[in-house]
């Protein structure tokens, strides 16, 4: 895992087309903005896991 330190307003690049910008810090919460092409899905981890779980459940035999 790469660990980076950024200040509010600073950005990091993921590949050539994705940017992640620190928008604010309040207590133990960090607000970030992600700019990515439409074809790249961006989700919070818990949402991504739910999507994957739902896909898996739909693919199981006996589920309609």
UniProtKB/Swiss-Prot annotation:
Entry keyword NADP: no
GO cellular component: cytosol
Main location: cytoplasm
Xref: InterPro entries: CsrA, CsrA_sf
Compartment(s) of residence: Cytoplasm
GO molecular function term, any single one: mRNA 5'-UTR binding
Key words, A-Z: Activator, Cytoplasm, Repressor, RNA-binding, Translation regulation
Subunit note: Homodimer; the beta-strands of each monomer intercalate to form a hydrophobic core, while the alpha-helices form wings that extend away from the core.
SUPFAM superfamilies linked to this entry: CsrA-like (SSF117130)
Disulfide bridge map: none
UniProt KW Repressor keyword: yes
Function according to Swiss-Prot or TrEMBL: A key translational regulator that binds mRNA to regulate translation initiation and/or mRNA stability. Mediates global changes in gene expression, shifting from rapid growth to stress survival by linking envelope stress, the stringent response and the catabolite repression systems. Usually binds in the 5'-UTR; binding at or near the Shine-Dalgarno sequence prevents ribosome-binding, repressing translation, binding elsewhere in the 5'-UTR can activate translation and/or stabilize the mRNA. Its function is antagonized by small RNA(s).
Protein name in UniProt: Translational regulator CsrA
Single GO biological process annotation from the record: mRNA catabolic process
Pfam families assigned to the protein according to its UniProt record, in alphabetical order: CsrA
